[in-house]
Amino acid sequence: MKNTPFSFVIPVLNEADNIGHTLAILKSRFPNSETIVVDGGSSDGTDEIAKKDCDIFLESSAGRATQMNLGALRAQGEVLFFLHADTVPDFSEAEFSDQLSLSTIWGFCRLKLSGQKVIYKVISSLINKRSEITYVSSGDQMIFVRRAVFDALGGYGNLSLMEDIYLSKQLRVISKPQVMSLEVVSSSRRWEENGVIRTVVLMWTLRAAYFCGVSPNLLKKFY
């Protein structure tokens, strides 16, 4: 059992191309932190890669909310980080600790998409601005929260999609988030594979539908 103030919870499903790199970055930049990988039924060898490099490996049914809730149950850190497998912090444990306020209950980092095209810088900037204004973080901004508060709220709930919005809305009632100036770098693969315009339209449509009350189970079919 690792004695640490920070625990990273990483849900995975067929992330063999990313999980090894992400865990290596965490080991280098957050050497005193705990890494928990929760696999939702991968068939590409993700589990074998993760087992070698993480502190705790768990298996559950597929679904980010389900996976992250399970990982949080096993976490020992006072602060939980929820990190996507294709996203890495572009800063060190010491840099984060220096910025983290003792009074902070939750927060998130600035997003930087990995692509070199100007459009990815624009998209990153818009996502960051939206999150700063609404206090609603996207999952790839590495949401962090005090474990005691996360537990008291009941975690991510039992959602098949939009779990990041759900948690943010619960947390912002309690406290404003600390928006870090530190960046996390997230893969632009979805944007590259599906096209920028199509991806933007899909994501904004899904978010708008969720805010209007459409069930996450229904929205999942279009994701």
Q: Residue ranges of each PLM-predicted region?
A:
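Hydrophobic helical membrane-anchoring modules
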Residues: M1, K169-Y223
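Cell-envelope/extracellular polymer assembly enzymes that use nucleotide-activated donors
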Residues: P5-S7, E34, Y166
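Short, well-formed alpha-helical segments that are part of the catalytic scaffolds
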Residues: N14-S28
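Conserved donor nucleotide-binding strand/loop of the catalytic core
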Residues: D47-R74
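Short aromatic/hydrophobic "clamp" motif used to bind/position activated sugar donors
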Residues: L80
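Conserved donor NDP-sugar-binding/catalytic core segment of glycosyltransferases
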Residues: F91-I119
